[in-house]
Curated annotation (Swiss-Prot):
Record-linked SMART domains: HMG
Intervals of motif 9aaTAD: 259-270
Superkingdom of origin organism: Eukaryota
Keywords for this protein: Cytoplasm, Developmental protein, DNA-binding, Gastrulation, Nucleus, Repressor, Transcription, Transcription regulation
UniProt source species: Xenopus tropicalis (Western clawed frog)
Main localization (coarse): nucleus
BP-aspect Gene Ontology terms: formation of primary germ layer; negative regulation of DNA-templated transcription; negative regulation of transcription by RNA polymerase II
Amino acid composition bias (Gly residues), ranges on this chain: 21-30
DNA-binding region (UniProt annotation): 40-108
Gene name per UniProt: sox3
One GO molecular-function entry: sequence-specific DNA binding
Protein name, UniProt field: Transcription factor Sox-3
Domain notes: The 9aaTAD motif is a transactivation domain present in a large number of yeast and animal transcription factors.
Disordered: annotated span: 1-41
One Gene Ontology CC term in the entry: cytoplasm
Amino acid sequence: MYSMLDTDLKSPVQQSNAPNGGPGTPGGKGNASIPDQERVKRPMNAFMVWSRGQRRKMAQENPKMHNSEISKRLGADWKLLSDSEKRPFIDEAKRLRAVHMKEYPDYKYRPRRKTKTLLKKDKYSLPGNLLAPGVSPVASSVGVGQRIDTYAHMNGWTNGAYSLMQDQLGYSQHPGMNSPQMQQIQHRYDMGGLQYSPMMSSAQTYMNAAASTYSMSPAYNQQSSTVMSLGSMGSVVKSEPSSPPPAITSHTQRACLGDLRDMISMYLPPGGDASDPSSLQSSRLHSVHQHYQSAAGPNGTVPLTHI
């Protein structure tokens, strides 16, 4: 077995020393083969001596198996071997190391630089020209994060805009917000992201309080001023079409009825009742009859000015 290993190991050395001729020699390649000759391989260890024959045999048995899979299986088989089975390969590795030291006394192992790991580290770092001369990469990353947070708060929805709006309202609360009328209005929807104009909120409250009034009651004046001040603060009051509080309803209804009666009594003849529908109809007919009498000519005929 040792003689077979010696022949396998000596043949590559002889082949590497053979093409030393010039460019005119048939086997030599001239100066192109000098870097290959200067590179000296490391001596094989015990595992490499053992796996050399085993690798060739396994590759012949499994031609489609990848070389990495073969190496994994050979490493597992090598660990299963006992010390007595490993002894001849260990001795052969020692002999090859001694021969290598005699042939290359000035040999020094110089491993190649692993450029892949360096590329991975430099992949996520910015070039030096993009940064300011006095700014470190850590400080620049912190500045970028703060800038992103600043722009994220502008849209009003992300990054807890609801909690931000509530904090602002907590520090500057209007005294009118603690009134029972405003608590009844705000109990349904209070969202910090949307914003309505104060005119829209006051108009909605006005439509819910009194639909056909011409004068605003004192209670409504106080309520609308509170709503407008709340809208100017930036909060949202979305009032659905529901019944207003009972106290405000009775007060506004009385004011509305009084105003309507005053307006209707202006057009009724004296002695008429505004609540009587027959008197209303007769007053309308009487006013129409007077209109046509005033428009008639001296002969009692209506002038044909409309033709």
